Every structure is written in structure tokens, then in C-alpha cells.
């Protein structure tokens, strides 16, 4: 069964990613999104639009040994700050959300790509996404 975890903020992300990547039998996917408010609403419009497609892709295509680490990058002001550690981290260099990364690989989707079920399927199946996203 796919395991899903949610963390908020950069330090919590780093800690969770380090811990979860210790499981060598699991495939770790990190999904960066905007922060949700108390009502569960995300300030990021693209994140809201991608959510149902992403949920469907997890259900249909993710291996049962997958781990989905959802990371809330902060509120709109925090995300816009050029000093935000998610922007400055040399491993991430996040420029837009949502972004989905197959952890410890170059395989990733960002922005509108996270709304495309076919691209999500390819990512979870680890096929050559680069050829498709360059079109």
C-alpha cells in the first residue's frame, strides 16, 4: 500500500526525506505544494487544480511500495521570498509549485505538468519523461 506523509517547512522536509530515503525497498516521491489554511484550502491555484489528478495517478500508477512525501513550502509570502530555502537549495532549486520529484533522481514534473495524468503515469512507471516534456 502506498504510504503518504505530510510535512511543513524546509527543515521538516529535509529531516523526513533523509529518514524516508533509508528504506531501500521503497520509491520515494516528493510533492511540493503551497501551504493549506485551516479549511484545507491551498493558496496555490495550480496545486488545487493538480490535486485530483495527482490523487488519481497515485491510486492507479504508484507501486505499492511507494512513499509520497507531501511538502508544504509555506504561504504565498514565504514562497515569493527569494531567500526561501526551497529556492536556494542546490539539490532542489524549486521555481514553481506544484513540483513532483522522484527523490534522488533527475525525474521531475512541475507546474502544469503535474495536471497531466499521462505524464504522472510515466513518472510513476519511471519511463523517459524528458522526451515527452520537451515536445
Q: Where do the PLM segments sit?
A:
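Thiol-based oxidoreductase modules, predominantly thioredoxin-like and allied folds used
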Residues: 6-8, 58-83
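Conserved redox-active cysteine motifs that mediate thiol-disulfide chemistry
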Residues: 36-53
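A structure-centric feature marking long, well-folded core domains of fungal metabolic enzymes
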Residues: 29, 37, 53-56, 66-68, ...
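Short, surface-exposed loop/helix-turn segments at secondary-structure junctions
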Residues: 43-47, 79-85
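N-terminal leader/targeting and pre-domain segments
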Residues: 1-30, 34-35, 71-73, 123-135
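Non-catalytic, surface beta->alpha helical segment in thiol-disulfide oxidoreductase systems
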Residues: 90-135
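A structural signal for the main folded, soluble domain(s) of proteins
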Residues: 6-32, 50, 85-90, 98-106, ...
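Short catalytic/ligand-binding loop motif for oxyanion handling, primarily in non-cytosolic enzymes
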Residues: 38-40, 78, 108-110
Amino acid at each position: 500500500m502506498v504510504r503518504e506523509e505530510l510535512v511543513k517547512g524546509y527543515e521538516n522536509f529535509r529531516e523526513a526525506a533523509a529518514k524516508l530515503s533509508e528504506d531501500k525497498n521503497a520509491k520515494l516521491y516528493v510533492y511540493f505544494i503551497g501551504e493549506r489554511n485551516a479549511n484545507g484550502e491551498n493558496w496555490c491555484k495550480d496545486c488545487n487544480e493538480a490535486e485530483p489528478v495527482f490523487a488519481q495517478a497515485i491510486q492507479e500508477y504508484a507501486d505499492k511500495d511507494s512513499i509520497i512525501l507531501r511538502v508544504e513550502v509555506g504561504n504565498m509570502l514565504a514562497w515569493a521570498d527569494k531567500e526561501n530555502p526551497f529556492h536556494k537549495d542546490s539539490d532542489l532549486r524549486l521555481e514553481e509549485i506544484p513540483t513532483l520529484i522522484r527523490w534522488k533522481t533527475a525525474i521531475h514534473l512541475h507546474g502544469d505538468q503535474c495536471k497531466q495524468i499521462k505524464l504522472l503515469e510515466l513518472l510513476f512507471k519511471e519511463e523517459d519523461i524528458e522526451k515527452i516534456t520537451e515536445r
